Design a protein with these regions (language model features):
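An N-terminal, globular interaction/scaffold subdomain
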Residues: 1-2
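A contiguous, surface-oriented mixed alpha/beta subdomain in the mid-to-C-terminal portion of proteins
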Residues: 29-182
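Long amphipathic all-alpha helical oligomerization modules
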Residues: 181, 185, 189-198
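Non-catalytic, well-ordered alpha-helical scaffold segments
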Residues: 100-104, 193, 205
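Short, recurring structural edge motifs at helix starts
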Residues: 88-96, 193-202
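Conserved small/polar residues in nucleotide/adenosyl-binding loops
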Residues: 203-209
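Alpha-helix capping and inter-helical loop/turn segments
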Residues: 5-6, 114-115, 190
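Long acidic/polar interaction regions in large eukaryotic complex-forming proteins
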Residues: 5, 9-27, 144, 152-155
Length: 210
């Protein structure tokens, strides 16, 4: 089971047009204080300041906080989409991505960091799509990475009519998302799904080239 190794590269254009802060200042920041200064007056300022005031924190904590904030905001915006088909497609796509971000984090925490259940839960995105609460609890309670993978293979992502992976498949974010897009695009060929699938393929292709 592997992470997606995401890395963001900014070269102007789209990001600079749509960001509500000085993107170059953010990319040039060499400390958390400089980063906070670069986003002063935006929705990110209070989030980063709150974390900065915590007694114990690391750069990873900031990354987790921003990820959680992003996914919570996306999920909230999806609920506002008026077209039912589009809303359901977005829920399936982003819900699957959130499930697997949480699964990958739990796996890494168990395999590489030997973290306790409370610390793992602290960094989880509080949204679930196809993972039931009982399954998440069971996964959190596993004692080894091997046991964790065994339990993941018993979830809806591997079993039932809506399964997107085969039992022998390697557990990776890329594989899950590509399979999910394939299923959705086959069912909804004239929807927003093919556009999102194209963007996903561009992203995974760029990540593979790095």
């Amino acid at each position: 089971m592997e992470g997606n190794g995401r890395e963001i590269t900014v070269s102007g254009g789209f990001f600079e047009r749509h960001a509500d802060f000085d993107l170059k200042a953010v990319m040039a920041a060499n400390s958390v204080q400089e980063l906070i200064q670069a986003v002063t007056g935006t929705e990110y300022e209070s989030l980063l300041k709150e974390l900065e005031s915590a007694a114990e924190k690391s750069y990873a904590d900031y990354a987790f906080a921003l990820d959680i904030y992003y996914y919570k905001k996306v999920w909230k915006e999806i609920t506002k989409v008026s077209d039912k088909e589009t809303r359901q497609i977005l829920e399936q796509i982003f819900g699957t991505e959130i499930d697997w971000q949480n699964l990958m984090w739990m796996y890494r925490a168990k395999r590489f960091y030997s973290m306790g259940e409370a610390d793992v839960k602290k960094h989880q995105i509080p949204v679930s799509c196809r993972l039931r609460s009982a399954e998440t609890k069971r996964l959190l309670e596993t004692e080894t990475a091997e046991q964790f993978v065994e339990f993941v293979r018993q979830t809806a992502y591997f079993r039932g009519k809506q399964a997107v992976l085969e039992p022998e498949d390697e557990l990776t974010w890329e594989r899950v998302m590509i399979r999910t897009y394939e299923k959705i695009c086959k069912k909804h060929p004239m929807s927003v799904a093919p556009v999102l699938r194209y963007l996903c393929l561009l992203y995974t292709s760029d990540a593979a080239d790095e």
